[in-house]
Amino acid sequence: VAFPTETVYGLGADAGNPDALAKLYSVKGRPTDHPVIVHLADAAQLGEWAREITPVAQKLARKFWPGPLTLILKRAPRVGDAVTGGQDTVGIRIPSHAIAHALLEKFGGGVAAPSANRFGRVSATTAAHVRQEFGDGVDLVLDGGASDVGIESTIVDATGAAPVLLRPGHISAREIEEAAGAPLALPTAHSPRAPGTLAAHYAPATPLLVMESDLLRELAATLTRQG
């Protein structure tokens, strides 16, 4: 099921169902070692999916949830490797979009929901984008209009004493530091892997050329002559 959030459209599956997760990875063409984010309706469900909730995590959750923030936390025992990519951490988000909230509240559990696009492609921000990307490959698309934010959620590693910004997004680094009451720490080689942080990601279908202005004028003139 594809559904709208305030950031981008998500492609959702039961985060506790290995078969549903396998189908999710297959439809997206996503590597199975690339973690997905678990979406919840309410912070009261957090203890089912994460453990050792740090003071930093509590402060950020109070400030930005529901909203476009994903927190990386230590995973609870029930959370499988298919969600975390084999890591000891899990990404959790509580979206603010009314349709997403209604869906999550009705479902009553965690929904694993990466962006509703094929792996490596640009994220969908409308229901039409989802249909264009997947055709009939998605069972149901909930149309909530265009996403308000239009980029994916900010991801913060909140497993330690200081927040670590793993993926920039709508929430700025300064806002994170102010809410956490601590300066951002730099990611290290041991930081958790996070969705949307590979070297090649969000690639448009249209080719992009980078060139000097003189060469650009020559190319434009050539294309004009060719019609």
Language-model segments: which ranges?
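Active-site-adjacent structural elements in enzyme catalytic cores
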Residues: 1-227
